[in-house]
Amino acid sequence: MSNASLLSTEAAAALLKAATADGRSIAPLRDRLAIADQDSAYAVQEINTRAWLAEGRRLVGRKIGLTSLAVQAQLGVDQPDFGMLFADMAVGDGEIVAAGRLIQPKVEAEVALILGRDLTQERHTYADLIRATEYAVPSIEIVDSRIENWNIKFVDTVADNASSGLFVLGGRPVRLSDIDLTACAMEMKRGDEIVSRGNGRACLGSPLNAAIWLADMMVRCGRPLQAGDIVLTGALGPMVAVKSGDRFDVSIDGLGNVSALFA
């Protein structure tokens, strides 16, 4: 591809925004961006974040992706990534998700943290995070990709809002002092079949490690985490592709259950 035909960050953002609105996928961006690096990918994401906020979408939190070392190795990176959570991405526990809302969805079981205080320091400690966290709940992240056939590398997924789709929160808040998030076991069923298992160690050694990484990163990016924000800390086990009619039930020891249904 000639330099003249390479995409600017603005052009790449426009392609992704249109794909999101139209419910369609596009070719990978990594070989089409004029500068295909981490900074450019987050610049694309930020352009669309600002556009969506200007259109009235409400920011309610962040998601952390690539918290599995195996997935990082697959994509050739040594760190997680993040994306924005908007209010219109929330789905009620057990609510049916219409097929038309998504392109090529997959589900992941995660721990969600709800913040009660801002996290604004340059470097945060476990104590900072524990003080700032109001409670934890079980969650299902319904990831989706605007990139054809999930043919993604780091630049593609970051630009595409970290492959965000929708999310479901469970209904039983638990304080961090009442649960061991490192050892907590997770089981996901599709119908009666167990399709994913894992525990807190699968998420950067602990969901708390992932949340601290995010808190520090958000300060550097100028969008620090605030009281009331939702933080999806990353997958506790393998993600699973979704088919029409599927029902997924997730159980996380010490946190409880959460479900997602697909029309």
Swiss-Prot record:
This protein's GO CC annotations: cytoplasm
Recorded metabolic or biological pathway in which this protein acts: Aromatic compound metabolism; 3-phenylpropanoate degradation
Keywords for this protein: Aromatic hydrocarbons catabolism, Lyase
GO molecular function: 2-oxopent-4-enoate hydratase activity; manganese ion binding
Catalysed reactions, as listed in the record: (S)-4-hydroxy-2-oxopentanoate = (2Z)-2-hydroxypenta-2,4-dienoate + H2O
Gene giving rise to this polypeptide: mhpD1
InterPro entries with a match to the protein in the record: Fumarylacetoacetase-like_C, Fumarylacetoacetase_C_sf, Hydratase-Decarb/MhpD_sf, Keto_pentenoate-hydratase
Organism, scientific name: Dechloromonas aromatica (strain RCB)
EC number: 4.2.1.80
Pfam families: FAA_hydrolase (PF01557)
Designated name of the protein: 2-keto-4-pentenoate hydratase 1
Family, per entry: Belongs to the hydratase/decarboxylase family. MhpD subfamily.
Job description of the protein: Catalyzes the conversion of 2-hydroxypentadienoic acid (enolic form of 2-oxopent-4-enoate) to 4-hydroxy-2-ketopentanoic acid.
Domain of life of the source: Bacteria
GO biological process per UniProt: 3-phenylpropionate catabolic process
Cofactor(s) this protein cannot do without: a divalent metal cation
